[in-house]
Amino acid sequence: MSATLDRLRRLQELRPQRTRPEPEAPPSPEPLPQPVVTPRGTTRLEELVPGEILENSAGLCYVRTQAYPLASARGQYPLGNLLARHPITFAPFHPNFGLRDTVDFRQAAFIDTETTGLGGGAGVYCFMVGVGTFECGVWSAECGIETNHPNAFPASSDPTHFVVRQFFMRNPAEEGALMFALAELLERYEMSVTFNGRTFDLPLLRTRLQQNQRMYPDLRGSARLLAAERPHLDLLHPARRLWKRRLQSCRLINLEQMILGLQRSEEDVPGHLIPMLYTDYMRTGNAHEMRRVFYHNCEDIVSMVALADHLGRAYAEPAAQSDTPLQGLDWLAMGQCYEKLGQLPSAENAYQQALALLREPAAQADAYQALAQVQKRQGNWPAASETW
C-alpha cells in the first residue's frame, strides 16, 4: 500500500503543475480633468464685470450699472435727442401699443433680456434683465466709462444721463432677488420700450414673475409695467414697416450697421450663443465669456435709444431727414403706411418722393401703381390716368 502511494506521488510530481494566476490589480481610474489654471482673478465675475451684490427679501443677485451722458453720440445724434421726440408719434401706425400723449420717453424703461433658451416656455429663465432709463444725479467717470455714484437719483423731468442697469442671477437660486429688484425699479416708470419684446421679452418676464409669485407672495401685484395693457413701444414693428423693402434683415445688429452706422467691437457675442455661454458659466464658474454677454446686452439697450430717435424722425417728419434722408424704398414704405391710415395726400407725396429716387424698374412699377391708386381714390382721375 505504501509502495503504491509512493508511485502515485512520483507520478503527480511529473505532471506539469498549474500555477495559480496572480490576482490582477484593479484598473487604475482615469485621471480627473484638471481645472484650467489661470492667473488669479481672471475668472471671477466681480473683477471681470464690476458691479455690486444686491440684497433684498428674496436673497442676492448681481447688478451692474453704467451711465452715459446725454451728449454721448450713438450714431449721428446724441442720446438726449430722443427726449425731443414723443412716443405718440407711433400711435397712429401702431394703435395696439397703447401709447398715450401723457407719457413720454422720460418715463420709459428700455428693456432687454438674455435667456437660457431661444424660445419661450416655463422652463426658460431670464438670467439677465437689462433696463435703461433717463435719470439725473451725480455720477463719476472711471476708465472712460460713466459708472453709478451712490448719490445718484432717478426719474427726473430734467435728466442728465441714460443709465443702464443689468440684473444678473449667478445661479437659479437668485432669480427671486432679481425679480424683486426689477419690480422695484419698474414701479417708477409708465412705459416700456423693447426690440421684439412684444412677442419675446415681456411675455417671458411675465411668466417668470408669475412663477416666482408662488414662492414670494410679496411679488404679487408688482411690476405692473410688464402687463400687456400698459404702454409698450416695440421698435421692431415700426422698423420693419419702414425698412423691410430695403434691408434683407431687420435684426437689431443689422439696423445698427445699415441705419445707425455703428459697428460693435470684437467683444460682442452672437445672440444665439448666449444660452450656451451661460450654461458653461454655471458649470465652470468661469465668467470670462459672461463679460461679452454683459457687453451685448448693454449695447442692445443703448442702441434702442438711437433707433427710437431715428424712427421718430422718420415717422414724424420724413421730409426733414436732412442728415440721414430716406431712400426711395423707404418712401415707398411710408406711402403704404399713410395709405393704410387713410392719409391719402401724405401717401401721394410719399410715392412721388419714392419715384424721384428709385432707379430699379420693379420698384418703380410698384410706386407708379400705388401712386395711381391713391390719385384715383382722391378723385383725381386726370393725374391717375397720366400716372398709369
Mark where each language-model region is:
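Metal-dependent phosphoesterase core characteristic of DEDDh/y 3'-5' exonuclease domains
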Residues: G123-E135, P159-R165, M191-S192, G197-E299
